[in-house]
Amino acid sequence: MSQFVLEIGFEELPSRFLPGLERELAERFARALDDDGVEHESIRVLTTPRRAAVLIEGINPVQREAEEVVPGPPVRVAFDAEGKPTKAAEGFARTQGVDMADIFTLSTDKGEYIAVRKRTGGANAADLIATACPTVVAALPFPKRMRWGSGDFTFGRPLRWLLALFDDAVVPFEVGGVVSGGVTWGHRIHGAGPLVVKSADDYLNVVIEKGGVTPDPAERRAMILAGGNAAAEAAGGRILWKESLLDEVQGLAEHPVPLLGDIDPSFLELPREVLLTSMESHQKSFGVEGPDGALLPHFLTVLNLTPLDVALVKKGWERVLRARLEDGRFFWKTDLAASFDAWLAELDNVIFLGPLGSMGDKTRRLEKLCAWLAKAAGVADESACARAGRLSKADLVSEMVGEFDTLQGIMGGIYARRMGEPETVAAALAEQYLPAGPDSPVPATLAGALLSIADKADTMAGCFGLGMIPTGAADPYALRRCALGIARIVLEHGLRIDVRELFRTALALYGERAWKLAPAEALVKLEEFFMARLKNHFMAAGHETLLVEAALAADTPEGAGIDVRAAGARLAALSDFSRRDDFGSAVLTFKRAANIIRKQGQEGGAVLDGAYSHALLAEDAEKALAARLEEVAPRFDALWAADDFASLFGLLGELRPAVDAFFDGVMVMCDDAAVRTNRLNLLKALTLRLGRLADFGALQM
């Protein structure tokens, strides 16, 4: 078996480009080899800031062979009455490059045709790979592409070299004016090169040993972790590893060397969040904490070389970080000399979103919406929630958030504590932007949860009123994330909030605006959008699609609104019910009842309200069903009020035998109109309760 290596050398790519580049190279080469019939055992992709290497092992040097039957014209056209080949047959043979002796008759459902067997494959795998390489490289996608020189070729960064070897032979091709060869380049300082690679098998040894490069991202990550942990342990602490930053720094170095530096202990007076953000965002460095969880006066950075003078390099990093921390201290002291009142006044000069007014307007709306939410959720301290809404965006005009925008909300909470606001308010301000994504936690405090809901609902209502509704992948105001965040917060906090009324109130608080959508229309679209996100959330949690659709389509009582908590509990109970052995037969029974009522309402024109007359109940089975319904009804209503959906589905099990007996022994659509309507109303009384739990008609069994 053979080996192949392709190394694409380029100027430093941003670290965030590398994971996608690895994935695309692996997928595109796998697809190209499969399409060409080149058998192989494995494909491995390694990336650094300056190179991407594709290593393919276990290659069959010869393309997979196969036999193909190529049909030609019908036999009646291919031969004349005397059985001699016609021009059609001769032309077919000539086109296929065979003699007439190679032609045979192929019988098909459509008749007999002449045909020829042709063997395909058997080509040199190296030649096929040489053809695939320029196509794959040129088509690689990047978040941003650039052009250099006088050509039109674009790539993530300028190409500098191409190494391509099939075993010990160069695979010749050209991309963007760069011709492939058998030469690579190492680390700029520890093994620049040029370095000759004699074979694909020798590639890693040359790059690592002679080039001073660690090409494997996982190995670089492990080196950073091991070196950083050892250095911190020697200083009596531990590194505060941030996964996203760790991923970034391993993609910034070909030769990673962790270095522990020191900071002036006086900077520890700054808030922990300020120190860490300054280290991480500006210097790509990690903080260090002691056994008690307090920050230590150290930081860890990652170099891209082994320094000759460690002390000198360390001193340089400390000097640069000190300047950053001095800026942070200045922002901190300046902000502490300000006040929330001053910041709130400044918010009136900060635009929220076009026609939707200023950030000051938004905070006044949030003050009222938080108070409404607190009352709806039964929170005792409505005033604290309202105060949190009013102060929620004040830190946006602070010096610190102006420099570190990722600290929005967090600094609001810190400043609230320093300026004497209640802890409830401070915690809410710090948590208002949670959850930041599908894997981010929701606010831990109830006040924070309500402020986050209010903020998201206000943004959604304003955008929908302006017709800014997400389409396709475009969602510039992250409205999908807002909707998902509201759903998660309500579910995880178990809040009983009518989301329809939430959006209605949020729209109303804007007052008179130059809306593109009337409030009533915007409300309908908001509901549809929110329910679609809720459905996606439940499916992502592992619930079956049909069960989710059935639970969300339940016919809740008029005026019930959108109760997300109840929907989640209803779906969980339905999912449990679906695991019962008799689930399928139960669904068929209840679905039959639902379908009869739906059909009579849509096609028969019957107006059914569930009120039936005992005097018209003639059959034993219908009397038994009526009695069972009346016995179960008070229990159903009590369980419904308690949101005990598991027990409600248990009641369905109790009802089912009576329903089955009804269908077995009673002719619903009888000739007597009065009796027929009475029986339909009996079924309507059943489905009025069934429909609250799920749309059984939507379930396919």
From Swiss-Prot:
Query: Which branch of life, at top level?
Result: Bacteria
A single BP term in Gene Ontology = glycyl-tRNA aminoacylation
**What catalytic reaction does the record list?**
tRNA(Gly) + glycine + ATP = glycyl-tRNA(Gly) + AMP + diphosphate
The alphabetical list of record keywords is: Aminoacyl-tRNA synthetase, ATP-binding, Cytoplasm, Ligase, Nucleotide-binding, Protein biosynthesis
Q: Which residues form a coiled coil?
A: none
- GO molecular-function term, one example from the UniProt record: glycine-tRNA ligase activity
Q: What is its EC number?
A: 6.1.1.14
Report one GO cellular component.
Answer: cytosol
Which InterPro entries does the record associate with it? DALR_anticod-bd, Gly-tRNA-synth_bsu, Gly-tRNA-synth_heterodimer
Cellular compartment(s): Cytoplasm
**What top-tier enzyme class does this entry carry?**
ligase
Task: Tell me how this protein assembles.
Answer: Tetramer of two alpha and two beta subunits.
In terms of PANTHER family, this protein maps to: GLYCINE--TRNA LIGASE, CHLOROPLASTIC_MITOCHONDRIAL 2, GLYCYL-TRNA SYNTHETASE
The entry's family comment says: Belongs to the class-II aminoacyl-tRNA synthetase family.
Q: What is this protein called?
A: Glycine--tRNA ligase beta subunit
Native organism: Nitratidesulfovibrio vulgaris (strain DSM 19637 / Miyazaki F) (Desulfovibrio vulgaris)
